[in-house]
Amino acid sequence: VSVDCSDYPMPACTMEYRPVCGSDNKTYGNKCNFCNAVVESNGTLTLSHFGKC
């Protein structure tokens, strides 16, 4: 399972709710929020699965 984060980070994310679960066992509201967190983690954060953790 993977998600393309090549277009990120973005300065602002929409409020669209399409949850994804990160390898940190945290639920991110959408791909944008998740990808921004991936960038901030220097690539150590990965996608666990789509949907809530």
Curated annotation (Swiss-Prot):
Of the GO CC terms on this record, one is: extracellular region
**Pfam families noted in UniProt:** Kazal_1
Kazal-like domain mapped to chain residues: 3-53
Q: List the disulfide bonds.
A: 5-35, 13-32, 21-53
Give the matching SMART domains: KAZAL
Keyword Magnesium among UniProt keywords: no
Give start-end of the signal peptide: none
Positions annotated as glycosylated: 42
Q: Which residues cross the membrane?
A: none
One GO term in the molecular function aspect is:
serine-type endopeptidase inhibitor activity
Concerning SUPFAM superfamilies, the annotation shows: Kazal-type serine protease inhibitors (SSF100895)
Q: Where in the cell is it found?
A: Secreted
Q: Where is this site: Reactive bond 3?
A: 15-16
| UniProt key word Repeat | yes
UniProt comment concerning the protein's domains: Avian ovomucoid consists of three homologous, tandem Kazal family inhibitory domains.
Q: What is this protein called?
A: Ovomucoid
What is the organism of origin for this protein? Answer: Arborophila torqueola
